[in-house]
């Protein structure tokens, strides 16, 4: 990094756990380097599927208390990653998890996708103007895997960054197909893996040709795993004690813990961004 001003990174995520799943290593790396990291979460994740049987009465179709529980999970995950500035867009519970495409949750009065995109973008712009990040991260136009809240997060972040005079780069977080497939092959060699191995093409990933930026997070994987463990309702983490590790969501599909996290530069100067979100800025 060659910035003359203190570097500031802002990440916009849809639900608690997305910050750890998609960008946990990146957050931990930059936080450890002294970068001011701000995480903005758009909903409480009220519609998430719950893994531990003892907690399933928190579900949206039962007590509907999952969102509050996930606030505490997110707080613990942020602590594991070194984040000291976390904010909910519009405040706690302003917008609700919309659920997957075609579900009744899409029409909830507080559903994120049912809300005003302009109001949401304005709320985010206010945070951007307060924090003044040089770099902002969110999802691509498909939201990584098509979740309506991820797509809306992409839309409002794109709008807010376009209206901002302080953001120098906008990145989309993506997953490398080559590294994901290599990681899956390594998982197949592990004994006692408690999850189902992914089928070819089953895990969300993009062609490596579109990736512009690769961030080495190999020294921060333990922090990422601690953050993932904090999301106990959503993620199961497995480690074999010999360096092997994997995690799974409620579908029980094994996902590799990759040494790099990948991004596509959506706007801003490309020079220097290949290995550092801030590379070449301010020089």
Curated annotation (Swiss-Prot):
Claim: Metal-binding is one of the keywords in the record: yes
Source superkingdom: Bacteria
NCBIfam families assigned to the protein according to its UniProt record, in alphabetical order: mycothiol_MshB
Protein name from the UniProt record: 1D-myo-inositol 2-acetamido-2-deoxy-alpha-D-glucopyranoside deacetylase
GO terms, molecular function: N-acetylglucosaminylinositol deacetylase activity; zinc ion binding
Alphabetical UniProt keywords: Hydrolase, Metal-binding, Zinc
Function summary: Catalyzes the deacetylation of 1D-myo-inositol 2-acetamido-2-deoxy-alpha-D-glucopyranoside (GlcNAc-Ins) in the mycothiol biosynthesis pathway.
């Amino acid at each position: 990094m060659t910035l003359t001003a203190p570097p500031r990174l802002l990440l916009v995520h849809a639900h608690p756990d997305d910050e750890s799943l998609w960008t946990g290593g990146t957050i931990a790396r930059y936080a450890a380097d002294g970068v001011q990291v701000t995480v903005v979460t758009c909903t409480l994740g009220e519609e998430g599927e719950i893994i531990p049987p003892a907690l399933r009465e928190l579900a949206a179709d039962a007590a509907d208390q999952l969102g509050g529980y996930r606030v505490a999970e997110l707080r613990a995950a942020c602590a594991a990653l070194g984040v000291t500035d976390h904010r909910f867009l519009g405040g706690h519970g302003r917008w609700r998890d919309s659920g997957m495409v075609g579900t009744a949750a899409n029409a909830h009065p507080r559903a994120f996708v049912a809300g005003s995109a302009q109001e949401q973008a304005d709320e985010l712009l206010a945070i951007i103007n307060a924090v003044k990040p040089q770099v902002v991260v969110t999802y691509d136009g498909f939201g990584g895997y098509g979740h309506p809240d991820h797509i809306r997060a992409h839309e409002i972040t794109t709008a807010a960054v376009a209206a901002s005079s302080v953001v120098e780069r906008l990145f989309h977080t993506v997953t490398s197909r080559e590294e994901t497939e290599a990681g899956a092959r390594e998982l197949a060699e592990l004994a006692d893996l408690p999850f189902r191995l992914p089928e070819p093409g089953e895990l969300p990933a993009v062609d490596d040709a579109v990736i512009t930026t690769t961030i080495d997070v190999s020294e921060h994987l333990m922090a990422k795993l601690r953050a993932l463990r904090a999301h106990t309702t959503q993620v199961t983490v497995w480690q074999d004690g010999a360096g092997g590790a994997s995690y799974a969501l409620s579908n029980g599909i094994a996902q590799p813990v990759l040494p790099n996290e990948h991004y596509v530069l959506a706007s801003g100067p490309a020079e220097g961004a290949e290995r550092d979100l801030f590379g070449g800025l301010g020089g």
